[in-house]
Amino acid sequence: MANVQQGQKDKIVLAYSGGLDTSIILKWLQTERNYDVVTFTADLGQGDEVEEARVKALNTGAVAAYALDLREEFVRDYVFPMFRAAALYEGYYLLGTSIARPLIAKKLVEIAEKEGAVAVSHGATGKGNDQVRFEMTAYALKPDIVTVAPWRDWDFQGRADLETFAREHGIPVPTTKKDPWSTDANLLHISYEGGILEDPWAEPPAHMFKLTVSPEEAPDQPEYVEVEFENGDPVAIGGERLSPAALLAKANEIGGRNGVGRIDLVENRFVGMKSRGVYETPGGTLLYHARRAVESLTLDREVLHQRDALAPKYAELVYNGFWFAPEREALQVYIDHVARSVTGTARLKLYKGNCTVVGRRAPRSLYDKDLVSFEAGGDYNQHDAGAFIKLNALRMRVQARVDAKRTQQEVARV
């Protein structure tokens, strides 16, 4: 519980969305924990009205309320560095929720320092990954910070208790029926979890999706788009140079109208359970495939394979909340060094949910047409291949001889 000294309450900074749950948390922190509450609402491109949330926080009792436009910082300093790593969690998930949490938590800590707050708080439940991501970041940046997680601490037994508390404290409770799933959105994706989606056999309803049209309803003609990269990052799409946030938004628009970027998976949470998530990541999907196409021309084979070997670990670190851990930062140094060579253009063909690479070019391409040609010439002498093969097969030939000798000895004993 917050302390009261000489009439002054301790301050706490709350990650506030403006929704019912975080409004209840705001009031609960005031009434049950005796904090002065400062709220922080991040604009990550989710489409919500952040200024409206700021005003609502003040009306609900916050002593101060921050609303910050973090779209460019989010894409430039978090999404794009992660893209350079070709990170996919468990082979599918482009980490749209995971990568947003360290930035939100970082701003919570910065505001706490500015306001002289002793604690930070969030609305993540005690069963999910977000509680870990928020709090790991907070501790990494400010080791002595106090974290308060109401969903782990309060005595409410269910939604009915929460709504009763809200009404008792003048917090409006929506009367319209809530969607039977939860969502989280930012410029990179929208996620859908819980409710009817907890049955892994149940197909998501068509009306659930917001960023993408159904592949069946996508245009009957393919759309082609070119994506340009410089030193590892996308800088232009469709011939238009854009800022990081604007480029990702444009990629979302292009991919979304072609039904690209839907995935449905069961993933392994860091806290130990499996959960089903449905994601829309149209722009991220386009940029992932485009980048891999340019990398295929510009990266040395062993460098590419080494980077790809590190990618699952990098993705795991992001997913589990270790963005500010030294091992993730060390990996980033190598990944950024590799990415310096990734300059070029990829051409994509989008058609009814499919994203296919149909062209790639690069000014410093390692692809040598003369070398791979079936015609004679170039620096490659086909006669050398025989010796190359024999040398690489040497250990297997030795193993085969040893195995054959052992088999003969076993037969002789019989």
UniProtKB/Swiss-Prot annotation:
One MF term in the entry's GO annotations: ATP binding
Coiled coil: none
Binding site for L-aspartate: T125, N129, D130
Enzyme Commission designation: 6.3.4.5
Cellular localisation: Cytoplasm
SUPFAM superfamilies: Adenine nucleotide alpha hydrolases-like (SSF52402), Argininosuccinate synthetase, C-terminal domain (SSF69864)
GO annotation, cellular component aspect: cytoplasm
Main location: cytoplasm
Gene3D superfamilies: Argininosuccinate synthetase, chain A, domain 2 (3.90.1260.10), HUPs (3.40.50.620)
Reactions that this protein is recorded to catalyse: L-citrulline + L-aspartate + ATP = 2-(N(omega)-L-arginino)succinate + AMP + diphosphate + H(+)
Swiss-Prot/TrEMBL GO biological process terms: argininosuccinate metabolic process; L-arginine biosynthetic process; urea cycle
Protein keywords: Amino-acid biosynthesis, Arginine biosynthesis, ATP-binding, Cytoplasm, Ligase, Nucleotide-binding
EC primary class: ligase
Binding positions for ATP per the UniProt entry: A15, Y16, S17, G18, G19, L20, D21, T22, S23, A42, G123
Binding annotation for L-citrulline: Y93, S98, N129, R133, S182, S191, E267, Y279
NCBIfam families: argG, PRK00509.1
Family that this chain belongs to: Belongs to the argininosuccinate synthase family. Type 1 subfamily.
Summary of subunit composition and partner proteins: Homotetramer.
Name of the featured protein: Argininosuccinate synthase
